[in-house]
């Protein structure tokens, strides 16, 4: 029964005037279990014929059938499956992968055939034992002689059963003794039922075959049958696996990717550098933005949450506002009666000289406030008492200090009951409160708080106030409250001669602004990620070029295009992923150092930014690794195997 049937087979190379007719109307059939030698000089077309038989190449025209299946119209993946199921290749130069042990080289075809991992190594060891290399299964190719390497190559050809063994000049790189050993193995495989097709130019080697086909200039010039094929041929054991994607194939691709990265440590590190810098920049910028945003929002909360301050004029940029003094104490009293307002305080202030004993302070601020001011602004009592309604009604000359003023004036002394003189007016200290955060950071002035009635009557004179601060009830929407408050004051004044600063609006504005800045700076930092991705693509293209022969070997033993694609894609993703993790760790280290030396605010790392960084580095690997991986997967097996 014929296992191979070829009819009117032609193969051309090149186009136009450079077109070469390599095989010319070749017709032949090979019986199952036969031992055939194809002879011819270099350039005769014998290797091209063997490549077409072995599904490494396709004919330009004609028919080539393996076990009755036409191969001319098969897809690349179908040809890969056929090579994995039917063929075992023995190459003149062995074509073993230098990074793998003898057993791993032998087991390689079984990965693409889908053989379970538990069986692969055991079968590889058995084959090596059969070929006299049982004690060499852990050796790398460079630790083996030429004859031993060729025996490993033969074992690899038998891994999936090797029903058809294709041997291309199997003794060409060996001495006579090793060559004779290889031929003895081939004769034994023939006895076991394997169909052997051997390409050689040596008549002595060809004499071992049952049949000798001689080719010259792409044509068969002789076909000599020396011995008949035995009528009862034992079929060799062939592994019937699943010829598709599997977990083992993925793990093999992952392992080979790691090996490739480790084999070129410095190159891999330099390739990762762009990714490391990009990820470090993005994560650090986001952490800085988060930290500064949290600090500013914390300071706003220190000024007072859900509060609004009403000022004279049309805005902070209104030059006429200093001359407009339309806010009155009666406005504050009216506002205090509204159901949506929790607390109200009129505000006025004066700057002057503070004298305490024999010490004088020139940067002192005296704030005239209502008794509800501390509730509105969220200031906590630290010592003594706060202002009361009686203090306001009676214009008592009492003051409450903030902590900074207390430390500057009295140091470690108890300030309660002590007298301070502001602009030649004596005031008795009754309490100490927490510092108020103004403008986002504490100021350098000494802050004293006194009843607004006292400041108006005894310091500034007049009845007009600078501002009114209200605290909105927690269950009221601040935007709705602001509209109601605006309409009320407009009705009281007859016009809108004031403006309102809403702490919630400021908070939202700051969040939006810092978010925009983070996005802008992150976008700039993202450019370095793109540059790093281009570097990864360049290195992967170099890697494909360096490992072209390896790709050809994998394809010859049954690897599909998807297997090659995933191997190089995983390598690119690994480089970017490792670079991304390194970038995150470097950013965290920078954050630790930053937080150790900077006390105003800290770098705040978020889980979202770290996860996003990891995903982005992976995405960069996929995007920039795809083109080199696709190039590797689309290589022609013959071209790849011919690469030195």
UniProtKB/Swiss-Prot annotation:
Main subcellular location of this protein, as a coarse class: membrane
GO CC aspect terms: plasma membrane
InterPro entries tied to this protein: AAA+_ATPase, ABC3_permease_C, ABC_transporter-like_ATP-bd, ABC_transporter-like_CS, MacB-like_ATP-bd, MacB_PCD, Macrolide_Exporter_MacB, P-loop_NTPase
Positions contributing to ATP binding: 40-47
Domain ABC transporter positions: 4-242
GO biological process: response to antibiotic
Record bears the keyword Metal-binding: no
Membrane topology: Multi-pass membrane protein
Phenotypic effect of disruption: Mutation does not produce a noticeable phenotype or alter the drug resistance profile and the hemolytic activity of A.actinomycetemcomitans.
Pfam families from the UniProt entry: ABC_tran (PF00005), FtsX (PF02687), MacB_PCD (PF12704)
Membrane-traversing stretches: 269-289, 524-544, 574-594, 608-628
UniProt keyword terms in alphabetical order: Antibiotic resistance, ATP-binding, Cell inner membrane, Cell membrane, Membrane, Nucleotide-binding, Translocase, Transmembrane, Transmembrane helix, Transport
Uppermost EC category: translocase
Subcellular location: Cell inner membrane
Source organism superkingdom: Bacteria
Cytoplasmic side: 1-268, 545-573, 629-644
Enzyme Commission no: 7.6.2.-
Cell membrane is among the record's keywords: yes
Residue intervals on the Periplasmic side: 290-523, 595-607
Gene Ontology molecular function: ATP binding; ATP hydrolysis activity; transmembrane transporter activity
Self-association and partners: Homodimer. Part of the tripartite efflux system MacAB-TdeA, which is composed of an inner membrane transporter, MacB, a periplasmic membrane fusion protein, MacA, and an outer membrane component, TdeA. The complex forms a large protein conduit and can translocate molecules across both the inner and outer membranes. Interacts with MacA.
Described function: Part of the tripartite efflux system MacAB-TdeA. MacB is a non-canonical ABC transporter that contains transmembrane domains (TMD), which form a pore in the inner membrane, and an ATP-binding domain (NBD), which is responsible for energy generation. Confers resistance against macrolides.
Family from the record: Belongs to the ABC transporter superfamily. Macrolide exporter (TC 3.A.1.122) family.
Protein name stated in the entry: Macrolide export ATP-binding/permease protein MacB
């Amino acid at each position: 029964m014929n296992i191979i049937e070829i009819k009117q087979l032609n193969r051309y190379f090149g186009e136009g005037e450079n077109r070469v007719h390599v095989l010319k109307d070749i017709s032949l059939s090979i019986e199952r279990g036969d031992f055939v030698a194809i002879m011819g000089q270099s350039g005769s077309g014998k290797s091209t014929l063997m490549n077409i038989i072995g599904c490494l190449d396709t004919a330009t025209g004609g028919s080539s059938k393996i076990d009755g299946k036409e191969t001319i119209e098969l897809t690349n993946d179908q040809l890969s499956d056929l090579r994995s199921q039917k063929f075992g290749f023995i190459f003149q130069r062995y074509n073993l992968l230098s990074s793998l042990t003898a057993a791993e080289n032998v087991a390689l075809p079984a990965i693409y055939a889908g053989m379970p991992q538990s069986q692969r190594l055991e079968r590889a060891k058995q084959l090596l034992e059969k070929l006299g290399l049982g004690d060499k299964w852990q050796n790398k190719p460079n630790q083996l002689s030429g004859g031993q390497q060729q025996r490993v190559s033969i074992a690899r050809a038998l891994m999936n059963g090797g029903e058809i063994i294709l041997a291309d000049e199997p003794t060409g790189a060996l001495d006579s003794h090793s060559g004779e050993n290889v031929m003895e193995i081939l004769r034994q495989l023939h006895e076991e039922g394997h169909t052997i097709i051997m390409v050689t130019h040596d008549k002595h080697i060809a004499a071992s075959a049952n049949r000798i086909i001689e080719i010259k200039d792409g044509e068969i010039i002789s076909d000599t049958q020396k011995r008949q094929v035995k009528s009862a041929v034992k079929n060799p054991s062939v592994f019937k696996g699943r010829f598709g994607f599997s977990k083992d194939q993925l793990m093999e691709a992952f392992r080979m990717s790691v090996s490739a990265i480790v084999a070129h440590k410095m190159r891999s590190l330099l390739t990762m550098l762009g990714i490391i810098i990009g990820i470090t920049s993005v994560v650090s910028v986001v952490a800085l933005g988060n930290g500064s945003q949290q600090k500013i929002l914390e300071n706003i909360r220190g000024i007072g949450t859900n509060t609004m301050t009403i000022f004279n004029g049309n805005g902070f940029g209104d030059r006429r506002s200093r001359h407009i003094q339309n806010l009155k104490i009666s406005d504050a009293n009216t506002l205090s009666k509204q159901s949506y307002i929790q607390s109200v305080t009129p505000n006025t202030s004066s700057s002057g000289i503070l004298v305490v004993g024999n010490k004088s302070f020139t940067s002192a601020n005296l704030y005239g406030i209502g008794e509800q001011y501390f509730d509105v602004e969220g200031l906590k009592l630290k010592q003594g008492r706060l202002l009361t309604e009686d203090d306001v009604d009676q214009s008592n000359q009492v003051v409450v200090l903030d902590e900074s003023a207390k430390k500057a004036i009295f140091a470690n002394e108890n300030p309660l009951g002590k007298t301070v003189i502001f602009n030649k007016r004596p005031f008795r200290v009754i309490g100490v409160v927490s510092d108020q955060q103004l403008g986002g950071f504490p100021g350098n002035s000494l802050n004293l708080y006194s009843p607004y009635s006292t400041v108006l009557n005894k310091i500034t004179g007049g009845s007009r106030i600078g501002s009114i601060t209200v605290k909105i009830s927690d269950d009221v929407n601040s935007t709705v409250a602001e509209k109601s408050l605006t309409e009320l004051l407009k009705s009281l004044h007859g016009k809108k001669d004031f403006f309102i600063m809403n702490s919630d609006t400021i908070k939202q504005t700051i969040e939006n602004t810092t978010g925009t800045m983070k996005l802008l700076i992150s976008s700039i930092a993202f450019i370095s990620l793109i540059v790093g991705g281009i570097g990864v693509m360049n290195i992967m293209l170099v890697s494909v070029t360096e490992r072209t022969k390896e790709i050809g070997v994998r394809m010859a033993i049954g690897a599909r295009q998807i297997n090659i694609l995933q191997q190089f894609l995983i390598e690119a993703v690994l480089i970017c992923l490792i670079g991304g993790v390194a970038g995150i760790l470097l950013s965290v280290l920078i954050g630790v150092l930053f937080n150790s030396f900077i006390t105003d605010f800290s770098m705040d790392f978020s889980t979202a930014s770290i996860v996003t960084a990891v995903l982005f580095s992976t995405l960069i690997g996929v995007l920039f690794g795809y083109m080199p991986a696709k190039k590797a997967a689309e290589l022609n097996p013959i071209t790849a195997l011919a690469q030195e």
